[in-house]
Amino acid sequence: MDFSKGHGTENDFVVLPDPDVRIDLSAPRVAALCDRRRGLGADGILRVAKAGALAGAGVLAELPDGTSEDDWFMDYRNADGSIAEMCGNGVRVFAHYLRAAGLESRDEFVVGSRAGGKPVIVHSADGAFGEVTVDMGVVRDLGTSAATIDGKVFNGIGIDVGNPHLACVDAHLTAASLSALDLTAAPGFDPGFFPHGVNVEILTRIDSGAVDMRVHERGVGETRSCGTGTVAAATAALRFDGADSGEVNVRIPGGQVTVAVSGGRATLRGPSVLVASGTLDDGWWNGLA
């Protein structure tokens, strides 16, 4: 079984081309493959197949809005094997992979996701490095809530970017004090507000057009970056300053991306890196069933 390994600002993924939808992505198999000791190690898996093929195989009950049967679809799985609606960094890596693998020749096309079709612009893409902008679509305000870390309460805004986020701006945080926070355990949150769990972002307020952010992703843990999380963070940071639109550079442990928010919609621009490709041993994979 062929694979590629890539990352978007060090949020890393195993890419599995599966045009005929023959790979059984059971939760135990996904978890083993993403385990950094048992398997290849990754924050998630990106299965590459056409949306129509996934629907025909029963992986998708129906085509999400804005997605046609002929669109390439990012079937995304978290590291624990759970299915996720959307991953902004994953879309960038996915689009880069399509170009690098010769599966897509256009600079602008739609990547299907469970959160709907995501138009992308591939600014550059070679065998290793790419730069991609993703139209992340509508950013929806869910209302105010709070996260708790080591007994400290961080007030924030619930934001839907195709998946749920709780973005907490703390005016007293600096880059140094942010890096000192313990995110090894999942932050506390209101399960009544977020019944399906939530991705939690803690960030500084905007300074010179930029914020610093850390994220704890549901089903994964703390990651070096989270694309949808950077969109939620930028939106929350702008609203913290009384603005509904603007461009924010979001610095995460894995690098930097640029988020533009306007008219209730957002775009995400950032790098993608493809670092390796190879073949998984069939005996190992089949032994996980």
Swiss-Prot record:
Domain of life of the native organism: Bacteria
Subcellular location: Cytoplasm
UniProt EC number: 5.1.1.7
Amino-acid positions noted as binding substrate in the UniProt annotation, renumbered to this chain: 11, 78, 88-89, 163, 199, 217-218, 227-228
GO biological process: lysine biosynthetic process via diaminopimelate
Gene Ontology molecular function terms on file: diaminopimelate epimerase activity
Any one cellular-component term (Gene Ontology): cytosol
Catalytic activity: (2S,6S)-2,6-diaminopimelate = meso-2,6-diaminopimelate
Record pathway: Amino-acid biosynthesis; L-lysine biosynthesis via DAP pathway; DL-2,6-diaminopimelate from LL-2,6-diaminopimelate: step 1/1
Active site (catalytic residues): 87 (proton donor), 226 (proton acceptor)
Major enzyme class: isomerase
Site (Could be important to modulate the pK values of the two catalytic cysteine residues): 165, 217
Keyword entries, A-Z: Amino-acid biosynthesis, Cytoplasm, Isomerase, Lysine biosynthesis
Entries under InterPro entries matching the protein: DAP_epimerase_AS (IPR018510), DAP_epimerase_DapF (IPR001653)
The family this protein is said to belong to: Belongs to the diaminopimelate epimerase family.
Role this protein plays: Catalyzes the stereoinversion of LL-2,6-diaminopimelate (L,L-DAP) to meso-diaminopimelate (meso-DAP), a precursor of L-lysine and an essential component of the bacterial peptidoglycan.
Oligomer status and interactors: Homodimer.
PANTHER family: DIAMINOPIMELATE EPIMERASE (PTHR31689:SF0), DIAMINOPIMELATE EPIMERASE, CHLOROPLASTIC (PTHR31689)
Record protein name field: Diaminopimelate epimerase
Lineage: Bacteria, Bacillati, Actinomycetota, Actinomycetes, Mycobacteriales
